[in-house]
UniProtKB/Swiss-Prot annotation, chain B:
Physiological role: May play a role in DNA repair. It seems to be involved in an RecBC-independent recombinational process of DNA repair. It may act with RecF and RecO.
Recorded family membership: Belongs to the RecR family.
Protein name per the record: Recombination protein RecR
One of the record's GO molecular function terms: zinc ion binding
Organism whose genome encodes this protein: Xanthobacter autotrophicus (strain ATCC BAA-1158 / Py2)
Length: 242, 201
């Protein structure tokens, strides 16, 4: 068995003294593990850092084997992830969330989203918006996508300003007004793709955080990660007026 | 499965030696044979030294270093500059810095770095004592001597956040071209870090 694909390094574990088991989010084959011979060496260490995109060739005798990776660097992002706290915490959180995906289950959309986010993650102001978009995409891939296009009560596509915490569907201003204190605010940028003010990003992270917690993490006995809290705190500091 | 060539005691010795870093089954046999040949001159003192060390080694409750006394030799060394505290991931890193002899300050050993995919979270590291030490010892500067890896620097950012309220100067080691390193052989990440951290001549 042999294939070649692009992959983003999610994590690396030392295996024995000289080898490493590398976890990639590949473009066409989802989250996929493989062993890199000599992966614990000093020469390979800069390549095998989380967040880097690599060109991966996987070989094994049988498909169900873990197999061996031969990796070549494609995009090296180590410097940004090491320097910017929001990027380091944000990536850690995203890698943890991607770990929830079943192995070898293709999620090309998430691969493309993660790559695009990592390329733009250095910009602190857009990092919050990007993370909220990642979480929305992850919810959708896990089968818990939010329906933000039409009002759950009236079917209207206009004046969508709330989201129901129970159904995950948008609610228009007229229908939602009596229950406004119990509904989430729907940030416009999630629907329209416009550049949001910081307050909208806060709303978006609150929204995606709630659905990640109640629909994905709590049923698995998990909570929102420390890394996410650290990301939000680092992002808030970077966008706070001086 | 190769046939045993010696009695169970010797085979067990070989198996245990093979579990040491840098040694495989073949080299373990060579080490075992060397010890057997020098039973009186090497094997007996080694066994005695290991038994002695096993009974005496303790982890310093103050800094997490290993020594035969608690607090450890470094913590009780009054010639060290108490206004500075050097944070390292493991005892091996502490020994490396001591070998270099460039710092004369106490240390704090975390016991690893954050690695959520491996299940290492903040509660698994020696962080609570670090915050307490920084406050109680009136530390002026905390040097984060952690590895230049994404996990190492994520840990450094996390500690910086933890110490935000302590109003202490938090620094980290420089990253860039290693001594003896030729640019042609360096990876893009190292070069990028080196360019960003360039200094005026």
């Amino acid at each position: 068995m042999e294939w070649t694909d692009e992959g983003i390094v999610l994590g690396v574990r030392r295996h024995g003294e000289g080898n490493a088991i590398v976890e990639l989010l590949t473009r066409l084959r989802g989250r996929h593990l493989g062993m890199v011979r000599g992966g614990a060496s000093r020469r390979q260490a800069p390549l095998l850092q989380p967040g880097n995109t690599v060109s991966a060739t996987w070989r094994a005798r049988l498909d169900e084997h873990m197999g061996n990776y031969a990796l070549e660097p494609a995009v090296v992002r180590t410097e940004v992830l090491m320097r910017a706290p929001h990027a380091a915490f944000g990536f850690t959180h995203m890698a943890q969330m991607l770990h929830l995906l079943p192995e070898r289950d293709p999620h090309e959309g998430l691969f493309l989203t993660l790559g695009a986010i990592l390329d733009a993650f250095e910009d602190r102001e857009s990092a919050g918006r990007l993370l909220a978009r990642f979480e929305l995409a992850l919810l959708a891939e896990l089968g818990f996508g939010l329906e933000l296009e039409t009002c759950a009560a009236t079917g209207s596509r206009e004046n969508l300003v709330y989201v129901s915490p129970k159904s995950g569907r948008a609610v228009c201003g007229e229908a939602g007004a009596p229950y406004a204190d119990r509904l989430f605010a729907l940030p416009r940028f999630l629907v329209e793709g416009t550049a949001p003010p910081a307050g909208d990003v806060e709303d978006a992270l609150r929204l995606t955080g709630h659905f990640l917690l109640t629909r994905v993490l709590e049923p698995r006995g998990l909570g929102l990660s420390d890394a996410r809290a650290a990301f939000v705190s680092a992002w808030r500091r970077s966008t706070a007026p001086v | 499965m190769p046939r045993a060539v010696a009695g169970p005691e010797i085979e067990r010795l070989i198996q245990l030696i093979a579990r040491l870093p840098g040694l495989g089954p073949r080299s373990a046999r060579r080490v075992a044979l060397h010890l057997i040949k020098k039973r009186e001159a090497l094997m007996a003192p080694l066994a005695a030294a290991m038994t002695d060390a096993l009974g005496k080694i303790v982890e310093c409750r103050r800094c997490g270093n290993v020594d035969v006394c608690d607090p450890c030799t470094i913590c009780t060394d009054t010639s060290r500059d108490r206004r500075t505290l050097v944070v390292v991931a493991d005892v091996g890193d502490l020994w490396a810095l001591e070998r270099a002899g460039v710092l004369n300050a106490p240390y704090h050993v975390l016991g690893g770095v954050l690695s959520p995919l491996d299940g290492v979270g903040p509660e698994d590291l020696n962080l609570a004592k670090l915050v307490t030490r920084v406050h109680e010892d009136e530390v002026g500067e905390v040097i984060l001597a952690l590895g230049a890896t994404v996990d190492g620097q994520t840990t450094a950012h996390y500690i910086t956040d933890l110490l935000r309220e302590a109003h202490v100067r938090v620094t980290r080691l420089a990253q860039g071209v290693p001594v003896g390193g030729e640019l042609d052989y360096l990876d893009e990440g190292t070069l990028s870090a080196a360019i960003r951290a360039r200094t005026q001549m």
